[in-house]
Amino acid sequence: MNRLKAAVIFVFIGTLSACQPEVDQISKNKPMHSGFAQQFGEPVNKYQGLSFPRDHGAHHQQGIEWWYVTANLEADNGDTFGVQWTLFRLSVDDQNTATETSPWWNGQLYFAHFAIQSDTQHHAFEKYGRSGQVNITAQPFEARLDDWQLASKEAAFLPLNLKAQQENYSANLVLANSPLVKHGEQGYSQKTHQGHASYYYSYPFLQAKGNITFAGETYQVTGDAWLDREWSSALIDPSQNGWDWFSIQADDKKQGGLMAFCIRNGKQSYDYCSASHITSGGVVRAIANNDVTLQVLKTSELTTQTAQTTPSNKSYPIKWQLNVEGFEPITIEARNPDSRNQLSIPYWEGRIKTQGGFKGKGYAELVGY
C-alpha cells in the first residue's frame, strides 16, 4: 500500500495544486518523498482490539483507511450487475501535527470510487475531497464525500443506505442483515512476513435491495453485498508490488463465505497469503499463510491508460486456483475480464464466480499490475 499511497499523494498534488493550505502542508511533509518504505502514522496495536460503534469511524492515527462495499446484483429482467462503492482516507500529516483551523484542512485527504459493471461493460468514476466535503461519523454512522454516501438509516449500524450517481450511472441500495466478522486475530490481520498488519473487519452477507441506473436505464435489483473496513499505517513491504484479494459468498447460504488475499513480491510471485472461512452465523476460522496457496490459470492482456500515464499493455490474471486448508481446490474466474478501474490509480475490481471446493460468487481486487 505504500506504493499506492505515494501514487495517490502525487495525484493529489496535481488535483489540489490551486488549493491552500493543502499544497503548503504537502510540500512541508518531506517524509512522503523518501520512498515507498515510508510508514504513515502509527502501526496498529495488536492488543488494542476492536470496539463498536467507535471503530465504524475514522482512525487518524493510521495513515490509510477505507470503507468498501461490493455487490452482486440481479435485476427483475434477469440481467446481472456489479457495484463497488469506496471511500478512502489518506493521512498526509503522518505526525498528526496539522494546526490549520480551516474546516477545509485536517491533515487528511479523501477520495471515493464508484464503479458499476455488466458482463461486458465496466464504468468507474472517482471524486476527490477535502475535509469540508466529507463527513465520517461512527454513530449514527455516515461515510460521505459530497453526495456519494454510505450511511445508517437509523441509530443502529444496519441497515445501510448506499448512494452514488455519476453521468448515466447510479446506485441506490439498502444493505441489511449480516453479522460483523473479524479477520485474523480478532481483527488484527497480518499482511507480510515482515509483520505489516491492519485492523480488518467485514459485514460479509449483506442483503442488497434497491435500484441502479446503467447507461441511462433504471433497474430494480436485489442481491448480495460485502462491506470491508480496514485501516493501517502500511499494508505491505516496499519490496512487494500489490495483492490479489477475493471475497466469496457461497451459492448455498448455509456454507457461508470465504475471504482470501495473497500479497505479491517484486517478481509478481505470491509471497504471503491468508484467508478466513466464515460460517453463515458469522463464526470465523482464520487460515494462516502455510495453509493458503494461489495459482494463476489464465491471464488477459489489456491496454491501460489514464490521464497520468501513457498507454501500456498489462497482463491481468482472470482465472485462478485457490487452495485453502479444509477445502478441495477452488477455481475462481472473472465474470468480466476487463474490470479495470482506469482512474488516477488504476486497478482491477470486478465480479467473480467460483467452482470446485467452494461454489459461489463474489469480487476480486487486483492491485499493482
Model-derived regions: residue spans:
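Structured soluble/peripheral alpha/beta segments that form catalytic or ligand/cofactor-binding pockets
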Residues: 20-369
